[in-house]
């Protein structure tokens, strides 16, 4: 009798285990959308082509983007990297000179070193400040009533719609070197200065002025991504946080908003770094090119000088490669740091 009972118990356990396994398989198939798992007997290429064919409509829809990306971004980058090892003046046949462009760039070209220091100075200030300001103002907009948010968003975002040249023209009036400039006029009337400040001619003022104008228009796509990120934060998290004793706005920012908007933080970091290292048109409009003692010279202006004025495409390509490596390296570092924090 005891043996029969054990056998019956074992049979019941087997049936239950089989049912659980079958149920798990059904759930796995449902989670996979009914798709078959990869057949590892096929080569990776065959499997890839098979998957592309099965999703041909999706690939057809994203094909225009990849075609434009390859044509206007990837191929020019490759061509620039190759031409950086040649002497090429756009007229004669390119001459292979190996590392000569890079040696001249870092050893003999004093203007590049000046442009490098100016660009780094600009990026170190504009990048972090605009990044933090974008997040702060997006958070501020999220605190105001819903009906007023579009108005505030447009007010903060509108300056970024202006091109660097257009902004420069407007701010030229503000920082004009004579008493007719708005800032000089206010300072003179207030008795704070006795003669106009040469904002656009004095070397010590040139880069600070460029930075101020750049920060005024720095709330761009990254700012909009932050606004969207705050909008998509699940409001139930705030209710749950109140139960746990998180009541102040600062606490909600630290424990809810920042973790929930981490994708936007990563996206904006890339945009901010790229934009802070590619300044050029704004500086040229405000202080001209060349600027007094090259105080407003940036890497982009130096690159444009060799590519568009001297037609030394090979050397300009070397400058572009160095700039690209800087942007990619710092962007990758920032991305990694934010991922670790998240």
Where do the PLM segments sit?
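Transmembrane alpha-helical segments of polytopic membrane transport and secretion proteins
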Residues: 1-61, 146-149, 333-342
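A structural signal for multi-pass alpha-helical bundles of membrane permease subunits
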Residues: 51-342
């Amino acid at each position: 009798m005891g043996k029969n009972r054990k056998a019956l118990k074992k049979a019941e356990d087997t049936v239950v285990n089989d049912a659980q396994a079958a149920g798990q398989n059904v759930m796995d198939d449902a989670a996979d959308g009914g798709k078959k798992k990869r057949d590892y007997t096929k080569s990776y290429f065959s499997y890839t082509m098979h998957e592309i064919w099965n999703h041909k409509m999706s690939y057809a829809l994203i094909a225009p983007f990849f075609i434009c990306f390859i044509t206007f971004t990837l191929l020019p980058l490759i061509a620039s990297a190759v031409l950086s090892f040649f002497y090429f003046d756009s007229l004669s046949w390119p001459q292979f000179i190996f590392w000569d462009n890079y040696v001249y760039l870092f050893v003999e070209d004093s203007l590049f070193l000046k442009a490098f220091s100016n660009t780094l100075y600009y990026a170190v200030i504009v990048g972090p400040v605009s990044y933090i300001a974008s997040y702060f103002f997006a958070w501020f907009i999220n605190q105001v009533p819903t009906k007023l948010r579009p108005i505030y968003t447009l007010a903060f975002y509108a300056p970024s719609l202006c091109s660097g040249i257009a902004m420069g023209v407007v701010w030229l009036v503000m920082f004009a070197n004579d008493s007719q400039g708005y800032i000089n006029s206010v300072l003179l009337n207030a008795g704070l200065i006795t003669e106009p400040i040469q904002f656009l001619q004095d070397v010590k003022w040139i880069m600070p002025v460029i930075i101020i104008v750049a920060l005024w228009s720095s709330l761009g796509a990254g700012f909009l991504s932050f606004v969207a990120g705050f909008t998509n934060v699940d409001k139930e998290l705030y209710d749950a946080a109140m139960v746990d004793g998180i009541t102040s706005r600062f606490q909600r920012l630290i424990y809810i908003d920042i973790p929930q908007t981490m994708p936007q933080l990563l996206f904006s970091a890339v945009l901010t770094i790229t934009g802070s290292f590619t300044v050029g048109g704004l500086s040229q409009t405000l202080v001209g090119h060349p600027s007094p003692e090259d105080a407003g010279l940036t890497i982009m202006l130096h690159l444009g000088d060799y590519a568009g004025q001297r037609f030394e495409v090979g050397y300009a390509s070397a400058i572009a490669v160095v700039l690209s490596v800087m942007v990619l390296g710092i962007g990758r570092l920032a991305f990694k740091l934010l991922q670790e924090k998240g």
